[in-house]
């Protein structure tokens, strides 16, 4: 399975995108770095062919780095969902700047049961879900579980490497399959006032979680 464009070219395009103007702590909004997004998308396409000519859902899309990257990797269409109107406005700016016509944006809560109208609809679901703070424990697993309901094939999701054993346990409970397909380093810059360090280096896993019959 080949890539539509080279990894370095993809990363260069993604670095030029607009990001969050005012990240909102209640939504745990952090930028997905261009190098993380590029390596993830390149791996997803070259190893599994899960982007080119596929129907893709970007859950919790933010300013849309995964959505736009998926289109650059040849996705047939992308549905980009986020709960934050401001984030979707930034995504729309990015779409307009690049003259993209196959990304549909939708303002809604991905975890709302109404999302299930897309049961088994998408070929591929992409997500960089909230890690889950003390006040929002388990949201990453709820995202992953909803993603599985929306795809007929695979979910590709970024998670802290420290949660690997927990995810392995959940996958077994849910009766699906999954494995880590890339180990990445996430240089998380200080985004909110309560962050004491200028940046924090976090080990991140790119997971492929999929239905047993896919």
Give each language-model segment a name.
Residues 2-214:
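Class I S-adenosyl-L-methionine-dependent methyltransferase catalytic core
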């Amino acid at each position: 399975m080949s890539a539509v464009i080279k990894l370095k070219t993809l990363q260069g395009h993604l670095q030029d995108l607009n990001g969050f103007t005012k990240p909102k702590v209640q939504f745990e909004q952090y930028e997905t770095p261009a190098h993380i997004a590029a390596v993830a998308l390149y791996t997803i396409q070259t190893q599994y062919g899960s982007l080119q000519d596929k129907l893709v859902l970007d859950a919790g899309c933010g300013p849309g780095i995964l959505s736009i990257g998926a289109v650059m990797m040849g996705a047939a269409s992308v549905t980009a969902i986020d709960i934050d109107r401001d984030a979707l406005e930034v995504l729309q700016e990015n779409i307009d700047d690049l003259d993209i016509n196959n990304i549909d944006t939708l303002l809604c809560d991905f975890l709302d049961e109404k999302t299930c109208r897309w049961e088994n609809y998408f070929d591929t679901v992409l997500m960089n879900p909230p890690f889950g703070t003390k006040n929002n424990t388990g949201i990453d697993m709820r995202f992953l579980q909803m993603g599985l309901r929306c795809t007929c094939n695979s979910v590709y999701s970024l998670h802290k490497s420290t949660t690997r054993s927990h995810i392995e346990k959940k996958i077994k409970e849910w009766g699906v399959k999954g494995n880590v397909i890339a180990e990445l380093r996430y240089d998380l810059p200080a985004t909110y006032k309560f962050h004491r360090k200028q940046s924090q280096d976090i080990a991140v896993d790119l997971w492929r979680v999929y239905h047993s019959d896919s």
